From Swiss-Prot:
Biological role: May act as a neurotransmitter, neuromodulator or neurohormone.
Keyword entries, A-Z: Amidation, Neuropeptide, Secreted
SS bonds (residue pairs): none
Organism, scientific name: Penaeus monodon
Protein name listed in UniProt: Peptide tyrosine phenylalanine 3
Phenylalanine amide modifications at: F9
Lineage: superkingdom: Eukaryota
Family affiliation: Belongs to the NPY family.
Tissue: Limited to neuronal cell bodies, neuronal processes and sinus gland.
Coiled-coil annotated residue ranges, if any: none
GO biological process, one term: neuropeptide signaling pathway
High-level lineage: Eukaryota, Metazoa, Ecdysozoa, Arthropoda, Crustacea
């Protein structure tokens, strides 16, 4: 999922 402009799994 994407959070605060940083894509993370």
């Amino acid at each position: 999922y994407a959070i605060a402009g940083r894509p993370r799994f």
